[in-house]
């Protein structure tokens, strides 16, 4: 029987359907090389496992019991990688096309059909708790792509694309905040990225739970048409005894994700071109200090997160 897989790498998807169940993982890697230019020895295929362990090169594809068009994320770099790493992101990227949300907010935040969609997510979306909520803690909701991780550049491992100070930031935040990850992708990729970054099982902090694109809703905006957003009301509805508008902050590089809860959103600078910017990006380091300051407050609703740096500077100079 033939085997068909889709390789996700460098922001692109590559279909491979020329292999059989008798072919091996190494044969798959050779096919990937012909499409991407990444040598087999430089490829790391996330989620390709046999009996819970990464599949060796000599394992037959038939033994992996892959479903048709299984998606596999690859880490790996071409020999001439820096040319690709330094290339500008595509012009249609979400970060480029993001828009200032202020003028749209009043139109969508309290619209009845949007609140009804949130109510349906509260009722139907299944949250898989990794660790129980802690009474008295605030809530920090974090995006992944371009917030914690440069997902477009190519690299050998996720650690090369990890935003500087990530683990220090999460360790510090965990002292005052329960941490939730919310990404506009599927849970399969969220799991893979968090494991690759060493977040899932880190001994210094715990993730309360993770949300995927199925927890998002679509809203109609007057100027931009239909867009997908991350409504915090889904979390507040499911965990009303722990979290609310007064104790929640959300970091995302895409402002429109805050359309249903603009007061709680902090638009983080996107982390891109990791190989160029790794040495100078201090966003998470500074934001950990901001979180320390606002954790002293009982109510975040008087804050304007757009001016978080000004607020932090003022507090540090007192």
UniProtKB/Swiss-Prot annotation:
EC number: 3.1.3.16
Gene Ontology annotations of biological process type: regulation of proteasome assembly
Residues the entry annotates as binding Mg(2+): 143, 145, 253
Species annotation: Danio rerio (Zebrafish)
One GO CC term on file: nucleus
Entry's Gene Ontology molecular function annotations: metal ion binding; protein serine/threonine phosphatase activity
All residue ranges annotated as the FCP1 homology domain in the record: 133-294
Taxonomic classification: Eukaryota, Metazoa, Chordata, Craniata, Vertebrata
CDD domains xref list: Ubl_UBLCP1
Ubiquitin-like domain residues: 3-81
Protein name: Ubiquitin-like domain-containing CTD phosphatase 1
Record's keyword terms, sorted: Hydrolase, Magnesium, Metal-binding, Nucleus, Protein phosphatase
Coarse class of the protein's main subcellular location: nucleus
Pfam families, A to Z: NIF (PF03031), ubiquitin (PF00240)
Known catalytic reactions: O-phospho-L-seryl-[protein] + H2O = L-seryl-[protein] + phosphate; O-phospho-L-threonyl-[protein] + H2O = L-threonyl-[protein] + phosphate
Domain of life: Eukaryota
InterPro entries from the UniProt entry: FCP1_dom (IPR004274), HAD-like_sf (IPR036412), HAD-SF_hydro_IIID (IPR011943), HAD_sf (IPR023214), Ubiquitin-like_dom (IPR000626), Ubiquitin-like_domsf (IPR029071), UBLCP1 (IPR051658)
Subcellular location: Nucleus
Function: Dephosphorylates 26S nuclear proteasomes, thereby decreasing their proteolytic activity. Recruited to the 19S regulatory particle of the 26S proteasome where it dephosphorylates 19S component psmc2 which impairs psmc2 ATPase activity and disrupts 26S proteasome assembly. Has also been reported to stimulate the proteolytic activity of the 26S proteasome.
SMART domains, sorted: CPDc, UBQ
């Amino acid at each position: 029987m033939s085997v068909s897989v889709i390789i996700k790498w460098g922001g692109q998807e590559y279909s491979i359907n020329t292999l059989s169940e008798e072919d091996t993982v190494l044969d798959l890697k050779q096919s990937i090389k012909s499409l991407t230019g990444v040598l087999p020895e430089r490829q790391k295929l996330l989620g390709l496992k046999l009996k819970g362990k990464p599949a060796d090169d000599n394992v037959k594809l038939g033994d992996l019991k892959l479903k048709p068009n299984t998606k596999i994320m690859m880490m790996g770099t071409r020999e001439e990688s820096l040319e690709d790493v330094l290339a500008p992101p595509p012009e249609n990227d979400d970060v480029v096309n993001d828009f200032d949300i202020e003028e749209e907010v009043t139109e969508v935040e309290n619209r009845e059909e949007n609140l009804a969609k949130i109510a349906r997510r509260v009722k139907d979306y299944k949250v898989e708790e990794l660790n129980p909520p802690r009474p008295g803690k605030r809530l920090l909701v974090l995006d992944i792509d371009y917030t914690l991780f440069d997902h477009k550049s190519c690299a050998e491992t996720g650690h090369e694309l990890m935003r500087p100070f990530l683990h220090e930031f999460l360790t510090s935040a965990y002292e005052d905040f329960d941490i939730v990850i919310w990404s506009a992708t599927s849970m399969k990729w969220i799991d893979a990225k968090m494991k690759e970054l060493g977040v899932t099982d880190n001994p210094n902090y715990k993730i309360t739970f993770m949300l995927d694109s199925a927890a998002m809703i679509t809203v109609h905006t007057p100027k931009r048409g239909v867009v997908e957003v991350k409504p915090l009301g889904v979390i507040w509805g499911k965990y009303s005894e722990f979290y609310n508008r007064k104790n929640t902050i959300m970091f995302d590089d895409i402002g429109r994700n805050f359309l249903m809860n603009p007061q709680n959103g902090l638009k983080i600078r996107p982390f891109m071109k990791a190989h160029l910017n790794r040495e100078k990006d201090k966003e998470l380091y500074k934001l950990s200090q901001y979180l320390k300051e606002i954790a002293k407050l009982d109510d975040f609703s008087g804050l304007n997160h757009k001016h978080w740096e000004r607020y932090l500077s003022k507090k540090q100079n007192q």
